[in-house]
């Protein structure tokens, strides 16, 4: 060793049912009237003993959202509706609104004129003429006058095309802009950092400006009626099938994303999901299932093809790959209640996929131990531009309804589209597992079913971390922060995180003797909160950093201390600043508090850092681009194979060098920082383990070590490891899906060695490296 102290690695193993994560351990606290989930925040006890301020040697986190914009569209009103389409009898539409099916539809369903096979599939929408085949239709035909003085006119237009065609006019002379987004500085743990943050206009919440700046006025709609959010020319599947419900209630961002999907202006790079299974060639035959590279066991399912087939044959979809029977529910323990599989239309009269209002924020767990999934789903609803990446808005219980839905998840570096039918497990006519507080809203129950299919069964979802679900729903990289032992310059790190689009959650340790103990200051112990904004304002005692925090309950249970609703501190803030902040004092569960009070009251924080691919896709979907930096990220895949590359941790010096090794070149220090250090996050994720739970395989303890390689460009040897201590490493090896560590180090040439704790433990893994500057990496 470089000094006389031997480097010893620690191992920690926890029971799978304790994998509830920072927010996961108290995620059941989002529930109004039910208690759910197994307890135990595994990192609660580990943070003080091992992490000392963040995974793998300390460090801070990212943050959530673009900053606020200065520019924007002004008032706007007085639009004149254009002529309706020509494909239907106008008077009949007025006499019988039940037959208003978004333009022309099947002739034999509503008795409209035209050719059954062609003309009536398309038709005109509410704002234009049209024509076309299976979803064509005209848009445009309406005029906006004086929308903030920025838009002069919109044209009309016809249209057509197959299934997702669309007509539409255009906007003329769209002026104005989004204004400047915030700048920012650094942060971290290793000898400080941070500083030089421009705090004056820092607004939190990812792309809060999108809803104000895009909406109907700033987007050229081709495939969606901007007034209703309906798909122009869509088939009224609810009339055909008899089990449909109400239209979705989409906000501005949802309408924009839906139109981009329908009109073909934006296409996500998503693969059909194929269920993995053990590979008999790698030990899945006589020696048991293999954790390495499971092979596909099902055929790819194309949502649009399957839906079209069902609509054509007038039948409801039944998924042959995830049957409505016990095989989809469990692999070891049968549910205590008798289960009946029902479609939403058999549960309630008017099912709706997505409703408006607070009900979308109130997700109830049910009787499955997946509170970690509930917390992630509730967090996702706060950001429409992320929510609709997982819950595509091109599906509903009205338009094209055929009992088939799809959801999109991130799986080990790629996005997959999971197709399901809408038969849900119920008991006595009520949903058995996760569901929305509103009894006619079904996105959360269907999302949970798709997630269960992703991993094989509902039982496979028992025990997990919120970070695992957040990553699967965003593709981000998650960190844990112990606020009792915080990293240095945490405030600057949070500001930088908000600028870079990260998501924040926080909590207070639960009182084991009191369920959701309400404190005198209005906060609730053992409850999950989301941090949605950050701002520097002039307070009674000078400039003050305040945080906007949301209670997912969305009710009057709020912080009542300084900077709370209508507190005296707000008297020192100019009205213009309050207006710019969008400040409102409602009993909506959202409140502000000072950073100092936040640190005094909250104990844990979880950060999901969004990579450049996510931020780029948000830009493509919405047209809003972050003015500040985004993370630079590199990803590598590898495997620990028995007697080859599964060398175990540094404790096993004779085999440690056999592990996969990756060279990482960090060349840039953090911008605007004077200490010449760079922020870097390492994350090692083991693949497929949840899929293999039914075969008796669970997570193995994993971790990593990072060495300063100097001028060495090749693999490091046993002799090197014996003589040199690691420059960075995970503080312990834990049987979690992913181990993460944030560090601030000098730029240089480093070698990362991910490993299991014990030698010859097999698993496949993914290594991710995030940094603020240029990064170069390769496997050695």
From Swiss-Prot:
Instruction: Locate the compositionally biased regions of type Basic and acidic residues.
Output: 269-282
Q: In which tissues is it expressed?
A: Expressed in muscle and neuronal tissues. Expressed in the ventral and dorsal nerve cord, intestinal and hypodermal tissues.
Keywords, ordered alphabetically: Cytoplasm, Hydrolase, Protease, Thiol protease
Q: Which Gene3D superfamilies match?
A: 2.60.120.380, Cysteine proteinases
Q: Which GO terms describe its biological process?
A: cellular response to calcium ion; mitochondrion organization; muscle cell cellular homeostasis; necroptotic process; positive regulation of sarcomere organization; proteolysis
Spell out the Pfam families in the cross-references: Calpain_III (PF01067), Peptidase_C2 (PF00648)
Phenotype of gene-disrupted mutants: RNAi-mediated knockdown results in adult muscle defects which include irregularities in sarcomeric structures, disorganized integrin attachment complexes, and increased mitochondrial fragmentation. RNAi-mediated knockdown in integrin attachment complex component mutants unc-112 (e669su250) and unc-52 (r367) blocks the protein degradation which normally results from complex disruption. RNAi-mediated knockdown suppresses cell death in the neurodegenerative models deg-3 (u662), gsa-1 (Q227L) and mec-4 (u231).
- EC number(s) given by UniProt: 3.4.22.-
Top-level taxon of origin: Eukaryota
For region Disordered, the annotated ranges are 269-300
Question: Could you tell me where this protein is found in the cell?
Answer: Cytoplasm, Myofibril, Sarcomere, M line; Cytoplasm, Myofibril, Sarcomere
**What PROSITE patterns does the annotation carry?**
CALPAIN_CAT, THIOL_PROTEASE_CYS
Q: What does this protein do?
A: Calcium-regulated non-lysosomal thiol-protease which catalyzes limited proteolysis of substrates. Required for assembly and maintenance of integrin attachment complexes which are essential for maintenance of adult muscle. Proteolytic activity is activated in response to increased intracellular Ca(2+) levels during cell degeneration and promotes necrotic cell death.
Regarding protein family, the annotation reads: Belongs to the peptidase C2 family.
Which named protein is this? Calpain clp-1
* Annotated source species: Caenorhabditis elegans
């Amino acid at each position: 060793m470089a000094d006389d102290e031997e480097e010893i690695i620690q191992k920690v193993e926890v029971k799978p049912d304790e994998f509830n994560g920072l927010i996961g351990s108290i995620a059941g606290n989002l529930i109004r009237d039910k208690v759910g989930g197994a307890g135990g925040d595994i990192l609660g006890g580990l943070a003080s003993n091992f992490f000392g301020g963040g995974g793998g040697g300390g460090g801070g986190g990212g943050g959530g959202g673009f900053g606020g914009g200065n520019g924007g569209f002004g008032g706007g009103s007085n639009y004149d509706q254009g002529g309706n389409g020509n494909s239907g009898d106008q008077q009949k539409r007025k006499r019988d609104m039940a037959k208003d099916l978004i333009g022309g539809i099947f002739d034999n369903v509503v008795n409209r004129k035209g050719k059954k096979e062609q003309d009536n599939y398309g038709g005109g929408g509410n704002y234009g003429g049209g024509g076309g085949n299976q979803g064509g239709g005209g848009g445009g035909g309406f005029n906006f006058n004086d929308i903030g003085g920025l838009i002069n006119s919109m044209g009309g237009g016809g249209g057509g095309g197959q299934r997702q065609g669309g007509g539409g006019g255009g906007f003329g002379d769209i002026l104005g802009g989004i204004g400047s987004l915030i700048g920012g500085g650094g942060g971290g743990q290793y000898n400080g950092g941070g500083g030089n943050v421009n705090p004056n206009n820092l607004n939190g919440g990812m792309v809060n400006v999108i809803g104000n700046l895009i909406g109907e006025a700033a987007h050229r709609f081709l495939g969606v009626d901007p007034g209703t959010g309906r798909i122009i020319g869509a088939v009224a599947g609810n009339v055909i099938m008899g089990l449909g419900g109400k239209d979705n209630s989409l906000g501005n961002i949802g309408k924009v994303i839906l139109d981009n999907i329908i009109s073909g202006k934006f296409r996500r790079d998503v693969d059909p999901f194929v269920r993995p299974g053990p590979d008999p060639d790698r030990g899945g035959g006589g020696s048991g299932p293999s954790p390495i590279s499971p092979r596909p066991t099902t055929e790819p399912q194309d949502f649009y093809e399957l839906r079209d087939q069902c609509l054509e044959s007038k039948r409801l979809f039944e998924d042959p790959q995830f049957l409505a029977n016990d095989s989809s529910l469990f692999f070891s323990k049968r549910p205590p209640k008798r289960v009946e599989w029902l479609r939403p239309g058999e549960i309630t009269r008017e099912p709706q996929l997505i409703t408006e209002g607070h009900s979308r924020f109130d997700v109830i767990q049910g009787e499955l131990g997946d509170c970690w999934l509930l917390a992630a789903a509730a967090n996702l609803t706060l950001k429409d531009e992320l929510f609709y990446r997982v819950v595509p808005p091109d599906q509903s219980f009205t338009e094209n309804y055929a009992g088939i839905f799809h959801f999109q998840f991130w799986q080990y570096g790629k996005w997959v589209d999971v197709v399901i039918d809408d038969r849900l497990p119920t008991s006595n006519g009520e949903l058995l597992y996760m569901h929305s507080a509103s009894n006619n809203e079904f996105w959360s129950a269907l999302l949970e079913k798709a997630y269960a299919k992703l991993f094989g069964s509902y039982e496979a979802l028992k025990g997990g971390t919120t970070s695992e679900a957040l990553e699967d729903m965003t593709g981000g990289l998650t960190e844990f922060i112990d606020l009792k032992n915080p990293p240095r310059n945490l405030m600057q790190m949070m500001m930088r995180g908000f600028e870079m689009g990260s998501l924040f959650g926080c909590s207070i340790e639960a009182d084991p003797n009191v369920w959701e103990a309400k404190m005198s200051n209005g906060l609730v112990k053992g409850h999950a909160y989301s941090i949605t904004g950050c701002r520097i304002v002039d307070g009674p005692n000078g400039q003050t950093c305040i945080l906007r925090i949301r209670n997912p309950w969305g009710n009057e249970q709020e912080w009542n201390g300084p900077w709370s609703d209508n507190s005296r501190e707000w008297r020192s803030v100019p009205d213009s600043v309050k207006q710019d902040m969008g400040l409102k004092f409602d009993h909506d569960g959202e409140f502000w508090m000072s950073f100092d009070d936040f640190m005094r009251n909250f104990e844990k924080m979880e950060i999901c850092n969004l990579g450049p691919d996510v931020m780029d896709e948000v830009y493509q979907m919405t047209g809003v681009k972050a003015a500040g930096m985004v993370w630079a990220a590199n990803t590598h895949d590898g495997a620990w194979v028995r007697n080859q590359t599964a060398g175990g941790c540094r404790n096993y010096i004779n085999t440690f060098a056999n592990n996969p090794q990756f060279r990482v070149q960090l060349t840039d220090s953090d911008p605007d920082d004077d200490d010449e250090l760079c922020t870097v996050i390492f994350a090692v994720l083991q693949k497929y383990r949840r899929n293999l739970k039914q075969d008796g395989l669970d997570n193995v303890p994993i971790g990593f070590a990072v060495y300063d390689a100097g001028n060495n460009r090749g693999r490091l040897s046993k002799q090197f490891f014996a003589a040199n201590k690691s420059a960075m490493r995970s503080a312990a090896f834990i049987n979690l899906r992913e181990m993460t560590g944030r560090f601030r180090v000098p730029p240089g040439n480093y070698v990362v060695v991910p490993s299991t704790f014990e030698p010859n433990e097999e698993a496949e893994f993914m290594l991710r490296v995030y940094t603020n500057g240029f990064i170069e990496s390769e496997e050695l």
